[in-house]
């Protein structure tokens, strides 16, 4: 059976679940509101928050996704909600993936940007058929920024522009921060007005995210550490489209499919979130 990326909506339509019930559930989560550094993923990385942020970690982040999505297919390590400041209403989702050290030498041969966009558009339409009642259909319009690899900071960036069935427009900017044991997928969700480029949107987020000592990309030990079955180019193609890159090789492609890397998460900015955020910030000290 053909696999497609899973595309998720960040909030339910007014015809769906009761908003007060959602608020009650969200208020029971263990929101970290103090501006400080928080360890995640068994101390393998640290997120430093500002006074503008609410943070949930581990199982609480997974529960947040379940409350907002109605399923348990996506389990991040952390999620940040911007409750004030210049990026108010934007959100950041962090997921650490331990797949082994990723080499960068396959980037050029596996990144076909035009074909990738076509596959993303088709996959999103197909996924809409699987969406539960009360969730808005999503549509991808274009690259907001084509995928590129910054070898200086060992990070891949790309961004998608789209809209939902209510004609609310959104941008999803993604960074893959490479580490010794794999990568961290960092997803920024906001409005087109807040977006200039993936690097600009994600730069302060990446500056406040650090692998712990011993887990950084430069800490890799050749001949000792595990190496991923595919390079970063094949991985990005898979993450973006739900398909294996043609040049990745049969064994590498099989490994990617076995680990279900094709889950791509779209959490579009919608204006119903402002109402939820207002309720939550009543308790912010």
Model regions and ranges:
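Hydrophobic h-region of N-terminal signal peptides that target proteins for export
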Residues: 8-17, 274
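Sec-dependent signal peptide recognition
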Residues: 1-7, 262-264
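Secretory pathway targeting signatures of secreted, lumenal, and periplasmic proteins
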Residues: 35-38, 43-112, 116, 161, ...
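C-terminal single-pass membrane-anchor helix
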Residues: 228-285
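Acidic/polar residues at beta-strand termini and the immediately following turn/coil
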Residues: 38-42, 122, 126, 149-152, ...
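Short, well-structured beta-strand
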Residues: 84-93, 134-223
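Short N-terminal segments immediately surrounding and downstream of signal-peptide cleavage
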Residues: 19-36
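Sec/Tat-exported extracytoplasmic proteins
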Residues: 57, 120-135, 206, 210-213
